[in-house]
Amino acid sequence: MLRLLLLPLFLFTLSMCMGQTFQYSRGWTNGKRSFNAASPLLANGHLHRASELGLTDLYDLQDWSSDRRLERCLSQLQRSLIARNCVPGSDFNANRVDPDPENSAHPRLSNSNGENVLYSSANIPNRHRQSNELLEELSAAGGASAEPNVFGKH
């Protein structure tokens, strides 16, 4: 008689354990869909008691501050790029080759990769000569159009 009572109890316990293991192995947790989907930690079910402890507001505040910091960084970058490229009274053509970049009137408009080891002209001694030869070949092949700004007009 005892075996008849223990066998269903044992099978019920075994099925509950297997079901629970299956749920957690697939990422299913109790109340997973009830949390706020805005914060990724809560959506993954890592902080079950976050609403009880008041941590949802903390995570929303951290997301807001990082977004605000990113917006501020991007706006500063945009302002610096605009200020660099839109200098009043400067006649700067991006397609024009600067004849003497070392004695340029606007050193910040010239190529400033001299201190960078990867892009320094010491690593590529014939860089300027090769680009000038290519420009001459292109202008000779193009005939009358020796202007380097041919593609900018279209």
Curated annotation (Swiss-Prot):
Signal peptide residue numbers: 1-19
Pfam families in the record: Corazonin
Annotated positions of the Pyrrolidone carboxylic acid modification: Q20
GO biological process: acetaldehyde metabolic process; behavioral response to ethanol; cellular response to ethanol; courtship behavior; neuropeptide signaling pathway; positive regulation of heart contraction
Compositional bias ranges of the Polar residues kind: 109-119
GO molecular function, one term: neuropeptide hormone activity
Modification Asparagine amide, positions: N30
Keyword line: Amidation, Cleavage on pair of basic residues, Neuropeptide, Pyrrolidone carboxylic acid, Secreted, Signal
Example of a GO cellular component annotation carried by this entry: extracellular space
Expression sites by tissue: From late embryo to larva, expression is consistently detected in three neuronal groups: dorso-lateral neurons (DL), dorso-medial neurons (DM), and neurons in the ventral nerve cord (vCrz). Both the vCrz and DM groups die via programmed cell death during metamorphosis, whereas the DL neurons persist to adulthood. In adults, expression is seen in a cluster of six to eight neurons per lobe in the pars lateralis (DLP), in numerous neuronal cells in the optic lobes, and in a novel group of four abdominal ganglionic neurons present only in males (ms-aCrz).
Propeptide residue span(s): 70-154
Annotated segments matching region Disordered: 91-119
The family this protein is said to belong to: Belongs to the corazonin family.
Protein purpose: Cardioactive peptide. Corazonin is probably involved in the physiological regulation of the heart beat. Clock (Clk) and cycle (cyc) proteins negatively regulate Crz transcription in a cell-specific manner.
UniProt-recorded name of the protein: Pro-corazonin
